[in-house]
């Protein structure tokens, strides 16, 4: 999910006697972890090795598609744990590349926040465990804004004319417009999507700028008083100005999830289960969450992590942007093109 809207972590403590099933390479025991660079603090990997005698071999990929290609070529083997984005997890499961989880081997699975479970890519949570969540949110300067912003619908308030900075993701901006209308972010009905476009055009007078990179800077330098930001941008903005106000929109969250799974032919499934359970231990999950800067998926770790990375308990609605039909996507793109032109 490193490239998207979007993410966080989990853990548990295993006794040394559990690890009798690990493969041996001489006296060495290894677990091959396949994910993006920078997803774990070295301290966590080192502590796992100290506790279990299993060395974590960190193998990186640059895109989800690269991961899927390599895992497919290996026929679900070579790697013991994979962490990737929600949409590619669906494909990996459909292609038979993911192990159906033995929940009895995961003592700490109950630590996972139910808000991020039962998603489209794994509706019964049979194959994956959420690791991190990216959540774009509204952030504003209460000293510069005269209204109390509670949701997406408030972005249309006339008092916010020429004051909003938006990220540049066409599906996400269409999506929050749909949520403000009581519709799904993944609406397929072209007529409804056209109405979304009409509503979006009404927002144009309030938009100061649209950009994907460092959007938070417009809020920090005073160019904008309200911003809709990706997770990393939210945390960066709050680090610079802790007096900014973060809004968890009352219409619900749009988010992207990074999930972890055990490949169907993983060389060492015992090691994989042990690592997965280990990082669902609250203290370990908190270290991982603070390190990667995505939102926490581990409710047992919430009190231990940076409070800016914990979604409030009263937020119970969320939706992931999914692929839609070609006709629906074409209308979403048309909405976006017309909206950007109106903002110029």
What are the residue ranges of the model-derived segments?
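Extracytoplasmic ligand-binding site segments that recognize negatively charged/polar headgroups
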Residues: 41, 78-79, 83-206, 210-220
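Mature extracytoplasmic/periplasmic domains
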Residues: 254, 258, 263-320
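Short, low-complexity disordered leader/linker segments with a strong preference
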Residues: 1-31, 343-344
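General small-molecule cofactor/ligand-binding pocket signal
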Residues: 57-59, 208-210, 245-247
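Extracellular/periplasmic bilobal clamshell ligand-binding domains
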Residues: 305-344
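Periplasmic-binding protein-like
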Residues: 194-202, 240-264
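Early extracytoplasmic/lumenal segment of secretory-pathway proteins
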Residues: 24-91, 217
């Amino acid at each position: 999910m490193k490239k998207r809207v979007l993410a966080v972590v989990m853990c548990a403590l295993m006794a040394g006697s559990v690890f009798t099933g690990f493969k041996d390479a001489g006296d060495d025991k290894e677990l091959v972890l396949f994910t993006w660079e920078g997803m774990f603090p070295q301290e966590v990997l080192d502590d796992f090795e100290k506790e279990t005698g299993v060395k974590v071999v960190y193998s990186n990929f640059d895109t989800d598609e690269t991961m899927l290609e390599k895992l497919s070529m290996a026929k679900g083997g070579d790697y013991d744990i994979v962490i990737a984005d929600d949409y590619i997890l669906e494909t990996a499961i459909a292609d038979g590349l993911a192990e159906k989880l033995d929940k009895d081997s995961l003592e700490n699975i109950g630590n996972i926040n139910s808000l991020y479970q039962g998603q489209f890519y794994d509706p019964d949570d049979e194959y994956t465990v959420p690791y991190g969540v990216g959540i774009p949110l509204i952030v504003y300067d209460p000293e510069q804004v005269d209204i109390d912003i509670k949701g997406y619908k408030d972005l249309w308030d006339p008092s916010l004319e020429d004051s909003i900075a938006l990220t540049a993701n066409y599906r996400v901006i269409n999506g929050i417009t749909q949520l403000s209308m009581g519709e799904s972010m993944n609406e397929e009905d072209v007529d409804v999507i056209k109405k979304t476009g009409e509503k979006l055009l009404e927002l144009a007078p309030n938009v100061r700028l649209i950009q994907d990179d460092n959007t938070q800077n417009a809020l920090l330098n005073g160019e904008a008083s309200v911003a809709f930001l990706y997770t990393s941008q939210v945390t960066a903005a709050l680090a610079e100005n802790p007096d900014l106000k973060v809004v968890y929109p009352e219409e619900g969250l749009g988010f992207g999830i990074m999930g972890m799974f055990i490949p169907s032919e993983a060389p060492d499934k015992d090691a994989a289960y042990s690592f997965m359970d280990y990082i669902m231990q609250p203290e370990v999950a908190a270290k991982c969450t603070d390190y990667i800067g995505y939102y926490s998926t581990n409710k047992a770790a919430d009190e231990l992590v940076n409070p800016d990375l914990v979604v409030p308990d009263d937020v119970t609605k969320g939706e992931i942007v999914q692929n839609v039909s070609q006709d629906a996507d074409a209308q979403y793109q048309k909405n976006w093109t017309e909206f950007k032109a109106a903002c110029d």
